[in-house]
Amino acid sequence: MKRIIICLLGAVSGLVAVPAAAQQSSMQFGGLMFSHDLMLAEDFASLSRPANFGTARAMALGGAFTSLGADMSAMSINPAGLGMYRRSEISLTPMLSVAQGETANTLPWQGNNRTRFSFANVGAALNIFESSSGSLVSMTLGVGLNRVADFNTRYSYSSESVYDAASGQTVPTLADVFSQQLTYHGIFPNQDGALGYDYVPYFWPAILGYNGFMTSQAGDQMVPDMIGHNASAIYSVDVVNSGSINEFQIALGANINNILYVGATLGIQSVHKKTGITYQEQYLYDGAPVDRDGTPLASKLDYASLYQQTVLDGSGLNFKIGAIVRPVAGLRLGVAYHTPTFYSLDRTYAADIESSISNAANTSREINTDRTPVLSDDGPNSWEFVSPSRLLFGASYTFGTFAIVSVDYERDWYNGIRVKNVPDGQPGFIIQPEEYKLEFKNNFCATNAVRAGLELKPLPVLALRVGGGYTSSMLKDKSLYFNRPVATESHYLTAGVGFTLSRTTVLDLAYQYAVDSYSKYQLFFSMDADAGQPVTWSGLYDTSITRHYIALTLGFRF
């Protein structure tokens, strides 16, 4: 099957940022503005990062629930915890999320906040078997829906590069890199000056740049001839992510002699992620705009605004097994294994541009727009991959009815991610599964996560909780990944309170403060790979995301 482009151009395929197999020289092009027509290794890894969601009690305890149970979150963490239920329960957990983006040494542009309401968990645990004789004490069937990832973020900023008249060095622009890319690959307009989208989608942003007057043909090369040699540039970026991964779960837990608890969960995931990236360059002058020779420009480009959008939809399937043992009163030891999740993902990509041209005297202005076709990877031609496997260990101790201390350790093997299917494309213009495998083995590593929680019950009807967690980076060397921000380390702190409203009703409240660090990234760059030297580059940007979650669980036991 071919990748489907919704237009009359026919079916063509995507191109990676470094199509060395198709080129004789060694120029590379990349950064945040490139390679959104396909999925990079870091995209698969980012989809595989789990979040600490569940019931408010589990969230308040930092997610340290591998050795605990009698909670709906057990289906997501260690299904053996279902075996600790003595009664049936139904609960629902609405959640409010607020994400705030911050990029160091920049000014705010459009906005940095995303606020969303969702359900962190909805579930039912049904006690389907109970016996006062024999080794099997009880069995509990669990059915639930749990949020496992939240993609709702936004970061937006502006920065400026000022022309230095003393050195005469032009400021770097995306228009420069588009010009170099089109020239290097021999992509030029036809004799009528038209340049359409009958090229692989990797080139579409640069072709938009031509149609938006960011670059023009001058002999055997493309040049940004409507941007003055003496221009300063303001770079503005707005990245908006939305969507989530939710997992429908069917689980079974068993209690054996009130000492050993075992369980298993079948997880079916639903994936939706939409990303919109707006990048704008505005060109400013201290005086009249001139070309390299000092000749005034008759017309100049005031700004160009490029928008790229990807939409990802799909499903995943996994299996979880676990056990908890109570060797002595008060002590619980738990272990759980999560198989890799097999994902099948449909994906679309499209882009558009708006630019403004004015004459040197600023007495007339023209607004230009253009858009690409829609690239669609779906059906048999979708993306398929398996996420890391996960191994969890937990220990907890209960001090009578007064307190619980719980600690978890988790190891996730990101170097074990494997891509199983990619859209069928033009040879040399799409990454093959074997190439992804090599990258994951060489550049990614297993992560180590530690979680801890403490619960105090000063009164039989009141519980106070605190917790926290830390996860190490999935990258062996984060400096190698500068095409886009890749989540590295993360940490969070949690707190909560629980109320026993009656014998059958409980109410829990939790707050979580989480910070994700990301690799530094370029907005755009071109590089001579053989020489190992950059040609044009934006400089590195450093973005972090802070999240606030408030969850409320209402549970009914019967």
What are these regions (language model features)?
Residues M1-S26, F558:
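Bacterial Sec-dependent N-terminal signal peptides
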Residues L9, Y85, K274:
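Active-site-proximal flexible loops/turns
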Residues A56, L68-I77, L82-V162, N246:
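Outer-membrane beta-barrel translocator/receptor signature
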